[in-house]
Amino acid sequence: MGFGKSSPFLAFSILVLCQAGSLQATPLRSALETLPDPGALSEKEGRLLLAALVKAYVQRKTNELEQEEEQEETEDSSLDSSRAKRCSNLSTCVLSAYWKDLNNYHRYSGMGFGPETPGKKRDIANSLEKDLSSHFGVPTDAN
């Protein structure tokens, strides 16, 4: 199963080793052993083989990248479909949007709201009474 992916690399490495062996400054064989090998590749054949291997490698990589992009697109569309299923009931989506807005308003409004601020409600009520009494001309206590 892993051999199918590594076969272009194996052929490429064999080609490189053959080329490196022929380019050595001091040959390892004697002059008598340098008879032409019928299985050896000519320079043109080696270049064609190398070009074919590179082309196959590039094609395989582009196919892998396309498959990854398709998988990402299907994952994105599945997220959108799950959100659409959740928001199929319009009141649920509207309620959650209003809930977020309400929480943001109370969080950033500066008014105390909720169980975290038990004393501020009285302070706000007292300040409102003082403001209303000043508008209507009612005298306030000097406390």
UniProtKB/Swiss-Prot annotation:
Protein name per its UniProtKB record: Calcitonin
Organism (species): Ovis aries (Sheep)
PROSITE patterns: CALCITONIN
Keyword Coiled coil included in the entry's annotation: no
Composition bias, Basic and acidic residues: 118-133
Family from the record: Belongs to the calcitonin family.
Pfam families per record: Calc_CGRP_IAPP (PF00214)
Lineage, broadest ranks: Eukaryota, Metazoa, Chordata, Craniata, Vertebrata
Record PTM Phosphoserine, positions in chain: S42
GO terms under cellular component: extracellular space
